[in-house]
């Protein structure tokens, strides 16, 4: 049996409903990647730091409430307090990561000008709180669609379909790229880039398109 068949059947069922929402979100991503300021890019990087072990919805809410200026200017203590008020599970550590990442402001446009694999490796090395999944999330959210965001929900779907043997408890580059290749096969069958296919899967799971 085709291991992708069950997932593809589900995706085809929701494709028509999800498409206008996905296209709207994709336009936001392309606009941010092509004309976003360093500060806007840093806000998106901070969003990706926040969503790790939390939720996209929570990250969107925090990004809106704290704002670009808050991510750039608030003290670590004040940022931690704000994140705590917003219900983040790890407010102190995430505030620390965001503050430590401020050295990347004025370098992010250069980083995203590299190929996606090179930009991803650089972000994993230089940014606090940014691993393989989070760096892929950031790059997708600025319109680089060839990367896959291997979130636990995506991994669960791949595992249940028999596409992967187990769900990793942590990531090495080799392991991430190996499973990303499986996801890329799924995306190719669906007819969309990996970063776009992810949004359709999230619509299939949640009935909405976040980021």
Question: Can you say where each PLM-predicted feature lies in the sequence?
Answer:
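Structure-specific DNA junction-binding interface
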Residues: 1-86
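C-terminal accessory module of base-excision DNA glycosylases/AP lyases that mediates lesion recognition
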Residues: 1-31, 95-98, 102, 113-124, ...
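Hydrophobic (often cysteine-bearing) scaffold residues that line and stabilize catalytic clefts
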Residues: 38, 42, 55, 94, ...
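Short amphipathic alpha-helical interaction patches enriched in hydrophobic/aromatic residues
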Residues: 49, 83, 87, 142, ...
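Short alpha-helix boundary/capping elements
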Residues: 50-58, 70-71, 106, 146, ...
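Alpha-helical structural elements of signaling/regulatory helical domains
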Residues: 54, 89, 189-192
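Alpha-helix N-cap and coil->helix boundary residues
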Residues: 57-61, 74, 78, 93, ...
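Alpha-helical ds-nucleic-acid-binding substructure associated with the helix-hairpin-helix region
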Residues: 63-128
